[in-house]
Structures are given as structure tokens and as C-alpha cells.
């Protein structure tokens, strides 16, 4: 009888405390899986911190995805422009200035596609962490792209598509965003006040850090810049896409 009572008590203690109504449970709460069980206040505090970090990472991933598209498009534009004859560029921009620029354009044209992808990933990772001050470094390719676009007026319109590697990376990033959004949605469905507040604070912090971006660009060549100049609602990877 004592052994049976001990087993019954142990089973009762191991029960997950779940409610479909708003609650402030801390001990014996379970989230997503039975293995994610908080039997101490320390574990529950760790779960709150983890939920906070999860939402912050989701916000960073959203910014990184947009920035990767911007960096990739900028380098693809330069590589496409480098395939044109330099005659018009020399006439309109001057032979002295054009000589070094043409050599640089040739370097972009000969750049392997995998290297273009890696450089775009590197720059996206760096720029996604910019919070204060100038949004971008003063890089040669930014000035080069604006100069070439202002001098080359006879460019045939063309659609620039990502390479297979670029597309696979973009798909992978999207799947991560999509998966994180549903995990966060499931955490909200436990209606635990502490977890929901932790997620909301994570959204505030993540949005504040990673989404401080220009509202737009002013100037004739503003559209040629590689900065992120939009923050559309459709660009956020929220749940239930």
C-alpha cells in the first residue's frame, strides 16, 4: 500500500499543469513537449529568458532576410552593368575617372557567383546589427553603382534572378522564419502570462535593435543605394502565412 501510495504521489507530482485560460502558473508547467517541464522556479525563469531570446532571434532573422536580398541585388546589378561596353561610360564620365572604375567593374564581372553569395551574406550579417549612426559604411561599390547608373543611360531592362545557391539560402531563411513564427504562436496558446509578456518584450527589443532603418532615400540616385528603404507589413514572417 505504501509503495502504491508513493507511486501515485510521484505520478501526481510529474503531471503537467496546463490551462486553456489565462494563467500565471510557474511550477510544473510544460510547453510544446512533456520534456519541457518546469519543476523549479529557476527552470521557469530560464524558459522565460529562452522565449524572450527566441522572439529577438526571429526579429533579427527578418532583418537579415531583407538585407540579404538588398546586398545580393546590388552586387548582381554591378555584375550586369559590367557586361556592357565601356565606351558610353568613358564618354560621359571622363576617361580619367572611368579607367579605374572600368577595372573595378571588370573585377565584379569576373567574380564567381559563389563568392557573390558569400560576400552578400557577410555584409548582411554586419549591417543587420547596425543600430545607431550611419546605416552603412562608405563602400566603394555603393559609389560605383550610383556612378555607373548615372552614366549608362542605354541599359536594356532585364530581370535579375538569384542563382541556385542564392535561392536555396533564401528558402532556408524563410523556412526558419516560418518555423519560428509557429513555435512562438504555440507558446502564446498556453496562455501563460509570464511567457506571453516575455515574448512581447522580446518583440519590442528585437524590433528596436534590428529594424532601425531609413524611411527612404532623397536624391536623384537615391534608389540606387543598397540600404533597406522599406519596412512593409508583408515583409514580416509572422505566423499563419
Swiss-Prot record:
Compartments, record wording: Cytoplasmic vesicle membrane
Disulphide linkage map: none
Lumenal compartment residues: 1-41, 181-182
Check the record and name the InterPro entries matching this protein. Answer: Cop_transporter
Segments spanning the bilayer are: 42-62, 160-180, 183-203
**A GO term (biological process) for this protein?**
copper ion import
Q: Which GO terms describe its molecular function?
A: copper ion transmembrane transporter activity
Please give the residue ranges for the topological domain Cytoplasmic.
63-159, 204-241
UniProt main location, coarse: membrane
Q: Which GO terms describe its cellular component?
A: cytoplasmic vesicle membrane; endoplasmic reticulum; plasma membrane
Presence of the UniProt keyword Methyltransferase in the record: no
Q: How does it sit in the membrane?
A: Multi-pass membrane protein
Q: Which UniProt keywords apply?
A: Copper, Copper transport, Cytoplasmic vesicle, Ion transport, Membrane, Transmembrane, Transmembrane helix, Transport
Induction of its expression: By copper deprivation and repressed by copper excess.
What family name appears in the similarity comment?
Belongs to the copper transporter (Ctr) (TC 1.A.56) family. SLC31A subfamily.
Role description: Required for high affinity copper (probably reduced Cu I) transport into the cell.
This chain belongs to the protein called Copper transport protein CTR3
The organism of origin for this protein: Saccharomyces cerevisiae (strain ATCC 204508 / S288c) (Baker's yeast)
Amino acid at each position: 500500500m505504501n509503495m502504491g501510495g508513493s507511486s501515485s504521489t510521484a505520478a501526481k507530482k510529474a503531471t503537467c499543469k496546463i490551462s486553456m485560460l489565462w494563467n500565471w502558473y510557474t511550477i510544473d508547467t510544460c510547453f510544446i513537449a512533456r520534456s519541457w517541464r518546469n519543476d523549479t522556479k529557476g527552470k521557469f525563469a530560464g524558459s522565460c529568458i529562452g522565449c524572450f531570446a527566441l522572439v529577438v532571434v526571429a526579429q533579427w532573422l527578418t532583418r537579415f532576410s531583407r538585407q540579404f536580398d538588398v546586398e545580393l541585388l546590388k552586387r548582381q546589378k554591378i555584375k550586369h552593368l559590367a557586361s556592357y561596353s565601356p565606351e558610353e561610360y568613358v564618354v560621359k564620365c571622363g576617361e580619367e575617372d572611368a579607367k579605374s572604375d572600368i577595372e573595378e567593374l571588370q573585377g565584379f564581372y569576373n567574380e564567381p557567383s559563389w563568392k557573390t553569395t558569400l560576400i552578400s551574406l557577410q555584409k548582411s550579417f554586419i549591417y543587420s546589427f547596425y543600430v545607431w549612426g550611419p546605416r552603412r559604411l562608405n563602400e566603394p561599390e555603393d559609389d560605383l553603382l550610383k556612378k555607373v547608373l548615372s552614366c549608362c543611360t542605354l541599359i536594356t531592362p532585364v530581370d535579375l534572378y538569384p542563382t541556385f545557391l542564392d535561392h536555396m539560402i533564401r528558402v532556408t531563411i524563410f523556412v526558419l522564419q516560418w518555423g519560428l513564427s509557429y513555435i512562438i504562436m504555440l507558446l502564446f496558446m498556453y496562455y501563460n502570462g509570464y511567457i506571453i509578456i516575455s515574448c512581447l518584450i522580446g518583440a519590442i527589443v528585437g524590433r528596436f535593435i534590428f529594424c532601425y532603418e531609413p524611411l527612404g532615400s532623397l536624391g536623384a540616385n537615391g534608389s540606387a543605394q543598397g540600404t533597406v528603404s522599406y519596412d512593409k507589413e508583408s515583409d514580416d514572417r509572422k505566423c499563419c502565412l
